[in-house]
Amino acid sequence: MPRRCGIDTSILVRLATGEPAQDFDRVVAALTHLVEVEHVALFASHMVIVEAYVALQHHYAVSKPDAKAALRSVLTSGLVAPS
């Protein structure tokens, strides 16, 4: 059975926004290594998803539909799954 690890809100927001670019690339590389090499199943809890949804709107001025779409994209990418 693969090990499961949760990500926090800041990581989910970074994955959804791609900002800042240099950190985004580093985070994606590290998470990809965990999933593909170390066979870790990454997840975002429901609370983390809700916090990221609010943060995208409040701090990044992302509309509700765009925030939903960005989070859906991350959570269906195969890298991170909802819990």
PLM regions: where:
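Short, well-structured N-terminal submotif of metal-dependent ribonuclease cores
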Residues: 1-44, 59-66
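Acidic catalytic patch
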Residues: 19, 43-48, 69-83
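Short, catalytically relevant binding-site loops at active-site mouths
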Residues: 12-13, 49-51
